Every structure is written in structure tokens, then in C-alpha cells.
Swiss-Prot record:
It is a lipid-anchor. InterPro entries: UPF0323. One of its GO terms (cellular component) is plasma membrane. It comes from Helicobacter pylori (strain G27). This is UPF0323 lipoprotein HPG27_212.
Amino acid sequence: MKKPYRKISDYAIVGGLSALVMVSIVGCKSNADDKPKEQSSLSQSVQKGAFVILEEQKDKSYKVVEEYPSSRTHIIVRDLQGNERVLSNEEIQKLIKEEEAKIDNGTSKLVQPNNGGGSNEGSGFGLGSAILGSAAGAILGSYIGNKLFNNPNYQQNAQRTYKSPQAYQRSQNSFSKSAPSASSMGGASKGQSGFFGSSRPTSSPAVSSGTRGFNS
């Protein structure tokens, strides 16, 4: 099987820890299958993954600034000072479970109408909701997809988890290029807003993939 390689230019927009992690992901598939039974169903799809960079905003919320298809799922958090760290699988699972509870009781920003109508800085997505609005959320949180799949508020708010329309479009384009392999795995091939709308094996209602959800 051919290993995926990226052009050097693909890494120009990410730096520091995120660039090092991305290079290690692309150049070496190695540890993806080292512990096949260790992880729960929450993260069993990790090798059908996404490389996601979340950036802290001034209001302590988080936005997706970059994401790419990857053999494994890695989520990097960049703080206001530019420091980066990789979230552990345990941290990711905890964040998703906490966000699931908020979805169940209706307090998640992902399912609230128009997310309060705030601006990019004021939209208030925490780490959990930012993760579930990204490609990684459709993979790691696929087991709660039914709770979001037909939710029109989620479909709009998922776009708002991205820092800009350009970041969202880069993600769309990046995953579209890998659509054959992603679709064969039931993964996150993306032609719709909200990754839960395209990660399911059954057909899903069409949703606009424009930039309607962004406020500047």
C-alpha cells in the first residue's frame, strides 16, 4: 500500500509542534495499529483520521484553523501565546462525553439556534463543541451522530466552529481530494456543512456548503 506524501508547501501554513506532528503522521503510519483493542468504540476509527488545529480565541473559545485527512486523528490546541499541545485520547474522550451531556440537555452551543447570533470572537465554542464541529468530531464522536444528524442548528453552527470561511473551504477541499478512500471507509468525505451530515453510510439531506454560517 502506498504511503501518503504531502508537498512541502502543504506544511507552510502550520508551524511549531503542529508541523512536527503532521510530518510524523505522514511519514510514518507505525503506531496506528499497535493497540487495536485498547480503545473504546469512541475512538475505534482513529486510523481513518483527521489532523486538526484548534486555536484559542480572546474570549477563551476555540476555532478550527486547519484540518487535513490523516491516517490517525490528532488534535492540536494552540493558545493565545502561540503555544501548542497535542490532546491525549483520554482528554478527547472526556471532552466529547461532556459535550454529549450538553447536547442531551440542550445547552451545547452546537444545537442552540444561531449560537446566540454572536460574532466570531463571541460565538463561544468550547473545546468539546469545536471538536464535534470538526472532521475529528465526525470520526471520534460518530456514536452520537444521531443526536446531531438532522439538527438544523448543528448544521449551521458546525461552520461557525471554523475561524474563517477560508479555513472552512480549505477543509472542504482537502477532504474532497481524499473522498474515494474516505467514502470507502465510511469516513468524513465532505460535501455538506457539518461532518455528521456526510460521515454516515446512508444518504443525508443536502445542506449548503457556502459561508452563510460565518460572521466577521
